[in-house]
């Protein structure tokens, strides 16, 4: 039972951080990087 509880807690702790902190900043920064790369090095 304790292992199940720990696993659940880790999943719960990991999900919010990924969705609240990584999700909004991830895609946004990723898009910016891709745009910057495309602008600096346009595809032939």
From Swiss-Prot:
Residues 1-44 are annotated as: Disordered. GO terms for cellular component: extracellular region; host cell cytoplasm; host cell nucleolus. Keywords: Acetylation, Activator, AIDS, Apoptosis, Host cytoplasm, Host nucleus, Host-virus interaction, Isopeptide bond, Metal-binding, Methylation, Phosphoprotein, RNA-binding, Secreted, Transcription, Transcription regulation, Ubl conjugation, Zinc. It is found in: Host nucleus, Host nucleolus; Host cytoplasm; Secreted. Belongs to the lentiviruses Tat family. Interacts with host CCNT1. Associates with the P-TEFb complex composed at least of Tat, P-TEFb (CDK9 and CCNT1), TAR RNA, RNA Pol II. Recruits the HATs CREBBP, TAF1/TFIID, EP300, PCAF and GCN5L2. Interacts with host KAT5/Tip60; this interaction targets the latter to degradation. Interacts with the host deacetylase SIRT1. Interacts with host capping enzyme RNGTT; this interaction stimulates RNGTT. Binds to host KDR, and to the host integrins ITGAV/ITGB3 and ITGA5/ITGB1. Interacts with host KPNB1/importin beta-1 without previous binding to KPNA1/importin alpha-1. Interacts with EIF2AK2. GO terms for molecular function: metal ion binding; RNA binding. The transactivation domain mediates the interaction with CCNT1, GCN5L2, and MDM2. Acetylation by EP300, CREBBP, GCN5L2/GCN5 and PCAF regulates the transactivation activity of Tat. Residues 7-18 have a biased composition (Polar residues). This is Protein Tat. The lineage of its organism: Viruses, Riboviria, Pararnavirae, Artverviricota, Revtraviricetes. Transcriptional activator that increases RNA Pol II processivity, thereby increasing the level of full-length viral transcripts. Recognizes a hairpin structure at the 5'-LTR of the nascent viral mRNAs referred to as the transactivation responsive RNA element (TAR) and recruits the cyclin T1-CDK9 complex (P-TEFb complex) that will in turn hyperphosphorylate the RNA polymerase II to allow efficient elongation. The CDK9 component of P-TEFb and other Tat-activated kinases hyperphosphorylate the C-terminus of RNA Pol II that becomes stabilized and much more processive. Residues 26-36 have a biased composition (Basic and acidic residues). There is a cross-link at residue 14 (Glycyl lysine isopeptide (Lys-Gly) (interchain with G-Cter in ubiquitin)). A motif (Cell attachment site) lies at residues 21-23. This virus is cytopathically active and was harvested from the brain tissue of a neurological AIDS patient. HIV-1 lineages are divided in three main groups, M (for Major), O (for Outlier), and N (for New, or Non-M, Non-O). The vast majority of strains found worldwide belong to the group M. Group O seems to be endemic to and largely confined to Cameroon and neighboring countries in West Central Africa, where these viruses represent a small minority of HIV-1 strains. The group N is represented by a limited number of isolates from Cameroonian persons. The group M is further subdivided in 9 clades or subtypes (A to D, F to H, J and K).
């Amino acid at each position: 039972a304790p292992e199940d509880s720990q696993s659940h807690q880790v999943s719960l702790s990991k999900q919010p951080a990924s969705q609240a902190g990584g999700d909004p900043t991830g895609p946004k920064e990723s898009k910016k990087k891709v745009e910057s790369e495309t602008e600096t090095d346009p595809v032939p």
